[in-house]
Swiss-Prot record:
Keywords: Cell inner membrane, Cell membrane, Cytoplasm, GTP-binding, Membrane, Nucleotide-binding, Ribosome biogenesis, RNA-binding, rRNA-binding. This is GTPase Era. It comes from Vibrio cholerae serotype O1 (strain ATCC 39315 / El Tor Inaba N16961). CDD domains: Era, KH-II_Era. Residues 221-307 form the KH type-2 domain. InterPro entries: G_ERA_dom, GTP-bd, GTPase_Era-like, KH_dom-like_a/b, KH_dom_type_2, KH_sf_prok-type, P-loop_NTPase, Small_GTP-bd.
Length: 325
């Protein structure tokens, strides 16, 4: 096997299919829940956004970007897949927020019809092994999604990695993908449809996510915070939307976002020299919101120090982290 070159591009081309054009009726509908799981930073949120054809889950190069379970719905003719993008499962549980994120991810595995197990190319860690062990013990059909294959120089290594994992667990399908480039996600959608049970659709065809515009606004601000700040902040910052109003006079949304950090040094980091960093964060967040909401957005941001919020379950409950459990 090692002497044969595995042509992933040919594999993409040979299996890609278009969307269904069959009219949907209750008698022939298929619908099911699909959990997207994996360790932090393997591309789960990018994959969800690609599968849905629009951005509903924030992405970042930093691990543990997703803190909540995000539900996205993709309807294609008779088939409706209800995807759940989970926080990355990880071994480290020192803080209350980390424990809650693990619980949120684990609880997403209850009552699902299919699991997409996302791994990063040929890179395998202790966190991957932990997720793998959980899936071995669970009684769910699992599709192995080997993501970021475009970043692996030796394509034979990808094939060998898939073969090794398939020896340890019986996957219903194994699909090499590049979620960022959209490579092979049509093939993955086909495999998902093949495993959806016959059932009436849960949501209207135009429905995309269960998350409110208020929630999406907070996630967009948090994404920009992670994009424009250092490595320390993802675990120590959250965003609370204190105001989210539509004003018919301006035909726009007026949004007040409170950024909570744990230390004064972090506050200074977010604000930046002469307030330049918080201005950049606010501007980029506002542009994304306007694109998502389709209206003018008037965004104001504040930064406040709230020591120990990530270890305070009452604070986490008020911020919506425990509602996911």
């Amino acid at each position: 096997m090692a002497d044969q070159e595995f042509d992933i591009d040919a594999y993409f081309a040979s299996q890609s299919e278009g969307k269904s054009v069959v009219a949907s009726t209750p008698e022939n509908q298929h619908c099911g829940f699909v959990a997207i799981v994996g360790r932090p930073n393997v591309g789960k949120s990018t994959l969800l956004n690609n599968l849905l054809g629009q951005k509903i889950s924030i992405t970042s190069r930093k691990p543990q970007t997703t803190r909540h379970r995000i539900m996205g719905v993709e309807t294609d003719g008779n088939y409706q897949a209800i995807y759940v993008d989970t926080p990355g499962l990880h071994i480290e549980e020192k803080r209350a927020i980390n424990r809650l994120m693990n619980r949120a991810a684990s609880s997403s595995l209850s009552d699902v019809n299919l699991v997409l197990f996302v791994v990063e190319g040929t890179h395998w860690t202790a966190d991957d092994e932990m997720v793998f062990t959980k899936l071995q013990k669970a009684n769910f059909p699992v599709v192995l999604c080997v993501n970021k294959v475009d970043q692996v120089k030796d394509r034979n290594e990808v094939m060998l990695h898939m073969l090794e994992l398939s020896k340890r667990m019986q996957f219903v399908d194994i699909v090499p993908i590049s979620a960022k480039q959209g490579k092979n996600t049509d093939v993955l959608k086909k495999h998902v449809r093949d495993h959806l049970p016959k059932a009436v659709h849960h949501f209207p065809e135009e429905y995309v996510t269960d998350r409110s515009q208020r929630f999406m606004a907070s996630e967009i601000v948090r994404e920009k915070l992670m994009r424009f700040t250092g490595e320390e902040l993802p675990y120590s910052v959250t965003v609370e939307i204190e105001r989210f109003d539509y004003n018919p006079d301006t035909d726009g949304f007026h949004i007040n976002a409170l950024i909570l950090v744990e230390r004064i040094g972090q506050k200074k980091m977010v604000i930046g020299k002469n307030g330049e960093k918080i201005k950049t964060i606010g501007r980029e967040a506002r542009l994304d919101m306007e694109e998502l909401f389709g209206r003018k957005v008037y965004l104001e941001t504040w930064v406040k120090v709230k020591s120990g919020w990530a270890d305070d379950e009452r604070a986490l409950r008020s911020l919506g982290y425990i509602d996911d459990l």
